Amino acid sequence: MAGVVEQKSGLVRDKLGEASKRNGLINTRSLVAESRDGLVSVYPAPQYQSCRVVGSVASAGPDGARNEPLQQLLDPSTLQQSVESRYRPNLILYSESVLRPWGDGVAADCCETTFIEDRSPTKESLEYPDGKFIDLSPEDIKIHTLSYDVEEEEEFQELESDYSSDTESEDNFLVMPPRDHLGLSVFSMLCCFWPLGIAAFYLSHETNKAVAKGDFHQASTSSRRALFLAVLSITIGTGIYVGVAVALIAYLSKSNHL
């Protein structure tokens, strides 16, 4: 019965040893480091010299079963050396004693940026890193502003508005039909020099006919001629009336002297 129990315990230990070998560098059960030559103790201390295992040492028991290697505790000081032997050559592990002077030497070439919140300067003063304050008068404070001349833009807007108004007036003039000046023609025909008045009246009718046909060019030409003849008729008629009045006054004055 005891042999069966020892055999089962041996099988369990074998399984645990295989699992620990797959797990990596450290055998958590037997507490030995795995190397190419076998299992080597990781403790250099004198008190553990008797517990070192140089190889896969196994002793036969009374029942013929193999005994597992002796268990040892882990020495943390040798962990780094064991890990370094397993890493690639391009990965180098340095101790803190080596990194500290290196960091002190490089610190002079580095620049550190610190962000501080809610540290706005007081009114009319600025805070410097050494804790000193400097007072600034309103004359010393310079505010950089950017300005540009807007006169050219205003002139451009005025020219654009003038051009647009002229264009609209020209468009309205072209769209509006020419005037026939019929009333002025009738007045020149009845009250002024009637031959020119009759011609102006005739041209005013021609203007209406051209507008009805849609010939605005002919209508505008007839309208200008009618206006010219009507004004000329009024001018001549006014001159005739003034001449007749002067002649009548002169005749009456001569008759009174007689």
Curated annotation (Swiss-Prot):
The entry's keywords: Cell membrane, Cell projection, Endosome, Membrane, Phosphoprotein, Postsynaptic cell membrane, Signal-anchor, Synapse, Transmembrane, Transmembrane helix
Single GO molecular function: glutamate receptor binding
Membrane topology, record value: Single-pass type II membrane protein
Primary residence: membrane
Subcellular location: Cell membrane; Early endosome membrane; Postsynaptic density membrane; Synapse
Domain of life according to the entry: Eukaryota
Family label: Belongs to the CD225/Dispanin family.
Identification of the protein by name: Synapse differentiation-inducing gene protein 1
Organism: Bos taurus
Gene: SYNDIG1
